[in-house]
């Protein structure tokens, strides 16, 4: 899917989901008890059962009551239907909402999408909307040459 600057400009001003997830991150940290280690959680599958997106983390806790996954040393991956990697996000610490497939990164992260990458600190992302918003220390690299 090609980048749409009009779509990005339309969505960039609405921070309601950002605020919701930042609050969820803080609440998850307060409730955290004995996180599991080396966790892998599918977020979504294709109709054929193959994983479309997943979260892996060195340490994680799944909050069954809210659907949130809190993790440290997190990798969120999105795949194409043929199983190849479509996009990935590596983060120090984040919370992911399994229902909306969106998340908030507390600390540093890098997202790779094709031959482009973005990194920074304090990052909101939405897999469904293919949207990312970086709140500080942003850096964008693209392989686009034309």
Predicted region positions:
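Mature-chain termini and adjacent capping regions
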Residues: 1-146
């Amino acid at each position: 899917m090609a980048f749409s600057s009009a779509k990005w400009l339309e969505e960039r001003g609405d921070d309601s989901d950002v605020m919701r997830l930042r609050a969820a991150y803080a609440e998850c940290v307060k409730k955290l008890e004995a996180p599991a280690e080396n966790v892998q959680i599918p977020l979504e599958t294709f109709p054929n059962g193959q994983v479309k997106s997943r979260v892996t983390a060195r340490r994680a806790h799944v909050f069954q009551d809210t659907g949130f996954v809190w993790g440290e040393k997190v990798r969120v991956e999105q795949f194409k239907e043929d199983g190849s990697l479509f996009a990935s996000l590596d983060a120090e610490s984040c919370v992911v909402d399994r229902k909306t497939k969106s998340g908030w990164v507390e600390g540093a992260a890098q997202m790779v999408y094709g031959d482009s990458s973005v990194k920074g600190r304090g990052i909101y992302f939405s897999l469904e909307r293919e949207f990312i918003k970086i709140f500080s220390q942003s850096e964008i690299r693209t392989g686009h040459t034309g």
